[in-house]
Amino acid sequence: MQTSPDMFINRELSWLRFNSRVLDQCSKNLPLLEKLKFIAIYCTNLDEFYMIRVAGLKQLFSAGVNASSSDEMTPLQQLKAIRKYLHQEKELLERYFNEITSELEKENLFIKHYENLDENLKQKCDEYFFSNIFPVIVPIAVDATHPFPHLNNLSFSLAVKICDKAHPELVKFGMIRIPRVLPRFYEVSANIYVPIESIVHQHAEEIFPGYKLLASAAFRVTRNADMVIEEEEADDFMMILEQGLKLRRKGAFVRLQIQKDADEQIVEFLNTHMKIFHKDVYEYSILLNLPSLWQIAGNKTFTHLLSPLYTPKTLPPFDENLSIFDAVEKEDILIIQPFESFDPVYKFIKEASKDPEVISIRMTLYRVEKNSNIVQALIDAASDGKQVTVMVELKARFDEENNLHWAKALENAGAHVIYGITGFKVHAKVSQVIRKQGDKLKFYMHLSTGNYNASSAKIYTDVSYFTSKAEFARDTTSFFHILSGFSKNRRLQTLSMSPNQIKEKVLEMIRIETSKKNEGVIVAKMNSLVDSDIIQALYEASMEGVQIDLIIRGICCLKPDEEYSKNIRVRSIIGKYLEHARVFYFKHSEPNYFISSADWMPRNLERRLELMTPIYDERSKAKLAQFLRLQLSDNVLAYELKNNGEYEKIPSSEKIIDSQQTLEEYVSKIYKTLKKDTDQSRATHLASKLFKEN
């Protein structure tokens, strides 16, 4: 099949539409502070998009690259399209923010500027300024003897235009850097938040004594944060990475956000020194630095403005009184997070660290929280003399410094730490525990779609799979040998790994379904679909009558509902949990269910070490089948992709189905039912039965 550029949706525009769906949550009937969270998430996503994707396009344009995507849009065309899209969407962001803050005021929760406070609260702000703000802010003069300062990525500042009180004709420009140690808002009372820049503006003349404030403008800068590391030339990768992190802080400016109606001379002053293209200047009529809205959304006094807090549940066959190794030895176990608890994953490593029969623990780490109980358990195990091998991916973007910290701590404890594979990121999520019982070695494995991160496990939907099967023991051992040693053979037998093998396997399974024509069925859930070879194979399958359902949260470059894709339906689910699981079903493959750490993107399939895990266990397959069926029935959180690249909400029917809420309710129902039953085998059977029925 011959493909053409118009058969693909542009990757960058598809991502922007994903982020628009995040912002669209503000239009739904959600608690107000939940809407505020979605604004914070939307703005955080946009920060990273500019730091990496827009910065990359600017570099391609500067290098004279003409085409960089399957749709053959040039870097310049993409940059123009991105700017147009975001300048239009900025108005929607402003509208949602104003609507939400107005509704919050009706609930007696306020964001107020200094000038709108009563005298008593102004005095409290004044006291706070002199005790907490004044000692740490940095006043900066810019003139012939004071060069324009270095501004950190995502730094928040106040630009000022001032004049000498004795000589008003002498106008000067400077800025007040607001350090990150200060909160975004001063909580002047239990229900009133004052933007920090509002207080700083009020006291600008005390910061620059002898000068009169003529104008000020809050602004925020975004820099290129992508790092290029010459791994081939690195003798000490950790040192090279630390140097790269320092250089990241000096990346080129790619965006300037500034308050609307700012003094023209201030805007010119900033543009002159930063050399930012005027289309990359975004003027806002609302507050800047909105990722910090989490500070308000976390207000414990207004919990009625938040969704009810759900507590993940641990279901049989896991039991707090039963060894996790005994449970996994009896059967394979699959859990769906965060509806089911992440605790068994932690217990798997914690128990291994304390078990005298355990001789080896191996694990990959990609994104780890700052205070990780899992890593602490690994440190304890290494300190006790167990053989601990940990692959810490130091190139995990924006987690590099945290991962460096843990890598050093693990090394100091005696663990064997692998920093990465030259030219690749290790994105696979796998751990292996080896126990010696008598003269036999027993293997226990955990394979997952998500990170070993207890914090993100509460808000990301992922699938975890525990097994002790010999074929998984063989392949995970081979995988860790590939990571720690020299190996030209990067192929496994039961598991599939990338680079190359996962893509080959996926294409092979698509071809099998294609050969079955109208009998073929493919259901695939992932974060993003970009790979043009896989998209082409899906088009060919569709033309042969294969029914294809894709559940893709983020980027989708496939264009549905065309002559070549009339049997392909694409939906995206956006809810309070971030859909992160990768689950694939191919009707005529054996086995026909798979979970993976990899999306169908070139970076995952060609430039990362990933794993795809076949699911043989019948109970686990039934659980995945119900999970996919539920998501395909969702008519609350789901959007459908049209052939013009736009997404439409799926209309609700008589039966309202919110897939995330439904899973919360049914896992809770199973948990409550099981708490009444003390018979372990009956409880396990009932859990499976209830999940399937529900």
UniProtKB/Swiss-Prot annotation:
Catalytic activity line of the entry = [phosphate](n) + ATP = [phosphate](n+1) + ADP
Which top EC class applies here?
A: transferase
Membrane-traversing stretches? none
Q: Set out the biological process GO terms recorded for this chain's protein.
A: polyphosphate biosynthetic process
GO terms for MF = ATP binding; metal ion binding; polyphosphate kinase activity
- Provide this UniProt record's keywords sorted from A to Z: ATP-binding, Kinase, Magnesium, Metal-binding, Nucleotide-binding, Phosphoprotein, Transferase
Catalytic residues, chain numbering: 427
Tell me which cofactor or cofactors this protein depends on: Mg(2+)
Instruction: Identify this protein by name.
Output: Polyphosphate kinase
Q: Native species of this protein?
A: Campylobacter jejuni subsp. jejuni serotype O:2 (strain ATCC 700819 / NCTC 11168)
Q: What is the organism lineage in this UniProt record?
A: Bacteria, Pseudomonadati, Campylobacterota, Epsilonproteobacteria, Campylobacterales
